[in-house]
Amino acid sequence: MAFCVLTILTNMALAAPPLNILLTNDDGYLAPGIQALRAALLEAGHSVSLIAPVTNQSGSGTSITTEGVAYTSHGNQVWSVAGRPADAVRLGIGHIMQDNPPDIVVSGINFGQNVGQDVIVSGTVGAAVTAVQLGVPAISASAEINFDEANTGFPSTLTTFPWAAALVADLIRDPRARLEGSFLNLNFPTQKKLKGFKQARLAASSILSIDFKEIDQGLWRAGYETDPGDEPDSDRTLLGEGYITITQLGISYEPVALPSTDLSWIESITIDPKAVDAASVAP
């Protein structure tokens, strides 16, 4: 069953032709976020080539594998890459899709928000940066996690994936979402808090903490800083308030100064809550 969870106030977007998409992520090609996004993109009529890491590569940024990468075809335009998200994008554009280049690279949907200074280490965002560096428009998308759900598998995030994916599938039809020299970084709140879209500046803070704890003998892990601090209008704060945040990023990771590209058209999108409820089924 198809779900259209948004209505863009111009008819141009939904009337636009389907796109040829390179879909990737940093959680791995079988992760629930990318699988939900692939299903939504196909249902929206787009042509999708899923080219993503075979294993979780979270935190890899734009790093690449210098010793070469292997890839496996799984049929139905799905390939897994023994490398990082940037490897997958480079391999996709330069080799797998060489004769059928993508109109856009879509990266996500990440299991966890990519806001503030954490975009620097994000493989999800790094894949979008890599695409734009190679001259292909891109968009990155992530779904919020509630740290209180850590012991139960983050069910709110799992139910966010389907409706967020359907929204991305419609949003990218609008050519205004496909920028040159920069890209949109989207973060989706969990459904219960959903208020709509909001253009945001990149927060100066990071979720990543430097408070390391020993989790096993000789193995240390840093925790997370869940308090966003006092940063009004930042992506981190607005996401916590229930907005789908939109941040325009340059390919050297600097936030594009606001006001920049007019993104008010995205803020004017209305979301049908009944369609969101109907789509909120974990994949």
Regions from the PLM with identified roles:
Residues 1-11:
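Bacterial N-terminal signal peptides
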Residues 13-15:
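Boundary at the C-terminal end of the N-terminal hydrophobic targeting segment
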Residues 17, 21, 35-94, 100:
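A cross-family phosphate/adenosyl-ligand binding-site feature
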Residues 94-99, 126-137:
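Alpha-helix C-terminal capping segments
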Residues 103-104:
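Conserved acidic residues
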Residues 120-126:
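Charged helix-capping and loop-helix junction motifs
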Residues 132-156:
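Glycine-rich phosphate/pyrophosphate-binding loops
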Residues 157-282:
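Electrostatically charged, flexible surface regions
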